[in-house]
A protein has these predicted regions:
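Conserved, mostly hydrophobic/aromatic
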Residues: 6, 18, 32, 47, ...
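Active-site gating/metal-coordination segments in enzymes
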Residues: 95-130, 207
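N-terminal binding-site loop/beta-alpha segment at the start of enzyme catalytic domains
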Residues: 1-88, 108, 124, 169, ...
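Beta/alpha (TIM)-barrel catalytic core signal, keyed to glycine-rich beta->alpha loops juxtaposed to Asp/Glu
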Residues: 134-314
Length: 314
């Protein structure tokens, strides 16, 4: 499988990245290890995880996904060296008081979270360490517009960048990235890095699919001009673009049992549960069938053949 370079970093990854947020919740450890084995066998060299996983986030499963991956590394000698490993430090609480008591994201918080991830992952370095979401108020997770009235006290970006730089200098992190960011955030991280000689962000991990084009609204130009690669998550629109909800809807009696969008109430209410999302997905899914494709093939092709996308998390 071909590889692409992430931003200006030395990381070269496959255009497919294995997402792991269900490991430890919907997917048990044995099945998770089987998925990791299969992914590596098929040539995927990129894994993404986060300290807050598994999803939906619960106190008992905090760190479960990283622990499962770490156990797999321990059972598969040499596997770690074949992979680009990405993880994320959680931002301030989104209903998760068990993470730093729901407080902000200081330099000390970033360092402590990284140390925890390294222990759970049973590795001495994380190739790409990302801020999962900003400490400041941003239009993300279903929020469409910025509202300055919702701003609260926050750690300066420069201070967060210095903490990440310390982790890079210590050899615990190779490169850094962002997630659920805005054009302002990406530009500010790059500007401060260049101004102060600090590590430059290589990536931004944001939602991107046929029914979520928020990235196209100026963030694509920002990342293109600053050479920051997009890691596209939710390329299947939380399952809406697979076609499995076309007939049943997402909350009806015919909804597939155990389906995430039906089970994860917060995600359904915040993002994918809007009627217009399913309506748009149904139209794309029908278009795929009319052209001899499965809905999933069309949805993934949209990302795989899009100049905006570096790697697609699936």
């Amino acid at each position: 499988m071909k590889t692409i370079q992430l931003g200006q970093s030395g990381l070269h990854v496959t255009p497919i990245c294995l997402g792991t947020m269900t490991f430890g919740e919907q997917v048990g450890e044995a099945d998770s290890h089987a998925i990791l084995d299969r992914s590596l066998e098929r040539g995927v060299n990129f894994i993404d995880t986060a300290e807050m996983y598994a999803v939906p986030a619960r106190a008992p499963t905090f760190g479960a996904t990283e622990t499962i991956i770490g156990n797999w590394f321990a059972k598969r000698p040499g596997a770690r060296q074949k992979l680009v490993l990405a993880s994320k430090v959680a931002g301030p609480s989104r209903g998760m008081p068990w993470i730093r008591e729901g407080k902000g994201m200081t330099a000390a918080d970033i360092v402590a979270s990284c140390e925890g991830s390294l222990r759970r992952l049973q590795t001495d370095v994380i190739d790409l360490y990302q801020i999962h979401w900003p400490e400041r108020h941003v239009p993300a997770f279903g929020i469409q517009y910025y509202d300055p009235a919702k701003e609260t006290a926050q750690t300066p970006i420069h201070e967060q960048l210095q903490a990440l730089a310390g982790l890079v200098k210590a050899g615990k992190v190779r490169h850094i990235g962002l997630s659920n960011e805005t054009p302002y955030g990406v530009h500010e991280f790059v500007r401060l890095a260049e101004q102060h000689g600090l590590p430059r962000v290589a990536t931004v991990q944001n939602p991107y699919c046929l029914i979520n084009r928020s990235y196209d609204n100026a963030l694509d130009e920002t990342c293109h001009r600053l050479n920051v690669s997009l890691l596209a998550y939710s390329p299947l629109g939380f399952g809406l673009l697979t076609g499995k909800y076309d007939a049943s809807g997402i909350e009806g009696p015919g909804t597939p049992q155990g389906a995430r969008i039906a089970s994860y109430e917060s995600v359904r209410k915040q993002r994918w549960g809007r009627p217009e999302a399913l309506a748009a997905a149904r139209l794309y899914n029908q278009l795929a069938r009319e052209h001899g494709l499965t809905p999933t093939q069309l949805a993934l092709a949209f990302c795989y053949n899009n100049w905006r996308v570096g790697s697609t998390i699936i």
